[in-house]
Amino acid sequence: VPRVLRLVAACALTVAAVLPSSAAAKVPQGFFGVMVDGPATETPGILEREAPRIRAAGAQTVRFAIDWASAQPYATAAEVPEAERARFTDVDGVPTDLSRSDRIVRLLAAQGLRPLPVILHAPDWAAKFPGSLLTDPRRYASPPSGPEPYARFVAALARRYGPTGSLWSTVPPQRRRPIRTWQVWNEMNLNVFWNEPDFQEGYVPLLRATRAAVRAVDPRALIATGGLTNGSVPAWTALRRIYEAGGRGSFDVVAIHPYTRSAAGVLATVRATRRVTAARGQRTIPIVLTEVAFSSSGGDSPDARRFATWDTTERGQADRLRSTFRLLARQRRALGIGGVSWYTWLSPQARRANWSSYAGLSRLSGDRIVRKPALLTYRTTVRELSR
């Protein structure tokens, strides 16, 4: 990580030196978004209360996770315990429970928000490294054993939530927000999400199979790569490996998670990513930042020292958010930036948690939700930059 961050910092100095001073250009509808996870989606009642606030903050796209392992934990109906059978329906021969994602998609659509799902986590029956998370840490990070079960699952999601999806049959037309973009996995260049060397060897077939399966349901659907982040392998190098493994043509959107110390560093990662796509003849393929954030632990997080480059105070978090959004809006056309989502809406912020637990625009404090300075800054900056 330190070497990657030094590279980003060096590029950022160049970026900062050439930035125009003119006001940021306005962005189209859907450009700004936010992630909902953790307590926002897992604690009963919170998303019901927070979805209107997300809309009021100016977010137009909301990214959320669909956990494949939770939706399809059993390979066959015979494996389902009798006490659980009522919650499953048969989908392509696999017992499936979509109640969690149904709830989230309905809540977001009711507020006029665009759902952006990231689909990850292989169930044991479809995992390359099956086994309990408690006894085998690879379980959480295991890639699928093959691409087809995952591709069939995402195609089933498209039949449920796409333009002709069955979910919308009871929803008034004006309140429908069908899903058109599907994000395949998350941060595959980190072993906490894909615990196998040379991730691209298994990931490119997954992309290709998923795109074919989803396009058979919705010919205009878009497939986004999982968010490539600046880990030990930087985002642009990970993307280059996807291309080298034959990935061109298997995705429609490049997604990145440019965690770094500053707005200029974020833009430097976007520029490096664009150089890779241009070298492969894809100068105009959209680049979307499906996560960007700065931690506000102020050094309180135990890994703040390790990730000090993007750790700051609550006030510093708000300032960096404003700078980052303005810079991305200003460079949107030149670099083909398709959107940016803040990670995350609501943090648990248990004391001395890891850095990501301080990334939210709001935080839990006991049973209360505390609004951080970054939330007001998000709202005012999005209003400033939106058409």
Task: Indicate residue ranges for each PLM-predicted region.
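Sec-dependent signal peptide recognition
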Residues: 3-10, 166
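Bacterial N-terminal signal peptides
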Residues: 8-18
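Noncatalytic carbohydrate-binding groove/subsite architecture in carbohydrate-active enzymes
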Residues: 44, 151-180, 195-315, 322, ...
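Aromatic-rich peripheral "rim/lid" segments of glycoside hydrolase catalytic domains that contact
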Residues: 78-83, 178, 183, 188, ...
